[in-house]
Amino acid sequence: MTQFAFVFPGQGSQTVGMLADMAASYPIVEETFAEASAALGYDLWALTQQGPAEELNKTWQTQPALLTASVALYRVWQQHGGKAPAMMAGHSLGEYSALVCAGVIDFADAVRLVEMRGKFMQEAVPEGTGAMAAIIGLDDASIGKACEEAAEGQVVSPVNFNSPGQVVIAGHKEAVERAGAACKAAGAKRALPLPVSVPSHCALMKPAADKLAVELAKITFNAPTVPVVNNVDVKCETNGDAIRDALVRQLYNPVQWTKSVEYMAAQGVEHLYEVGPGKVLTGLTKRIVDTLTASALNEPSAMAAALEL
């Protein structure tokens, strides 16, 4: 059988009505959301199915919703005899989904933890003062240089290395605007402002990371049953303290997604299954390693087909 890995998406993959078809076919989806709702104290399934979108898109609600969606899909896979992947990795928030599915963190603990992570992130930067933008069609070094020159005493830096030619920058709103303009002047095809309220993975997140460290210390971490490639160092840690440390640093350091996918391919992985709503990571895969194939497990037909392999 082809060596495969599971990858778990981060924020941006949520939509109102996500996983409705999966829930109709697999009862464990709603059962998983019921567990999360009990941990949070509100009906998370109702929020994901009925919205409104502006509520679902609040980061402290987006994060538990996406984590739960990914865990629900993984449970469908397990329940129907799916084989264990060779490796796992998650993009930003998705790293928590991977750690739950690899048995490192208890699901209910993780749901509460990512809700707090969202609140800490929102508290760290007053709404309207931070921004993120996707830079399309410019090399990493030129983007880094544009950010350095545009900072002018503020914060702006590359924060998501999503694929060659697709890098997200984040920081103070004005600095992100200046850096976006500088990137276009340097030859970028586009600089697209992202509809987010929090500038994730930049230095402005350090206060949130300090609060997160306190909460992470309260949670039991087990050794992973499947290697999980982390975002910040592109390494598979097995020690609980090392995993905690990587999650703290992840909040104010770039997501090294390009390197993570390259690493998995170098370890012999040939196919990536995206375990979550949407197809963001599936779309990035070919741009990173053209010999890798990828598919999403977010529809009953796709799940059934993958389980038959």
Curated annotation (Swiss-Prot):
Q: One GO cellular component term, please give it.
A: cytosol
- Alphabetized UniProt keyword annotations: Acyltransferase, Fatty acid biosynthesis, Fatty acid metabolism, Lipid biosynthesis, Lipid metabolism, Transferase
Any one Gene Ontology molecular-function term assigned to this protein's record: [acyl-carrier-protein] S-malonyltransferase activity
Q: List the InterPro entries.
A: Ac_transferase_dom_sf, Acyl_transferase_dom, Acyl_Trfase/lysoPLipase, Mal-CoA-ACP_Trans/PKS_FabD, Malonyl_CoA-ACP_transAc, Malonyl_CoA-ACP_transAc_FabD, Malonyl_transacylase_ACP-bd
Q: Which Gene3D superfamilies match?
A: Malonyl-CoA ACP transacylase, ACP-binding, Malonyl-Coenzyme A Acyl Carrier Protein, domain 2
Question: What EC number(s) does this enzyme carry?
Answer: 2.3.1.39
Q: Which residues form the active site?
A: S92, H201
Presence of keyword Membrane = no
Class in the EC hierarchy, top level? transferase
| GO biological process terms, semicolon-separated | fatty acid biosynthetic process
**Does Cytoplasm appear among the keywords?**
no
Q: In which pathway does it act?
A: Lipid metabolism; fatty acid biosynthesis
Catalytic activity line of the entry: holo-[ACP] + malonyl-CoA = malonyl-[ACP] + CoA
NCBIfam families given for it?
A: fabD
Family the entry assigns: Belongs to the FabD family.
Protein name in the entry: Malonyl CoA-acyl carrier protein transacylase
Q: Which organism is it from?
A: Escherichia coli O157:H7
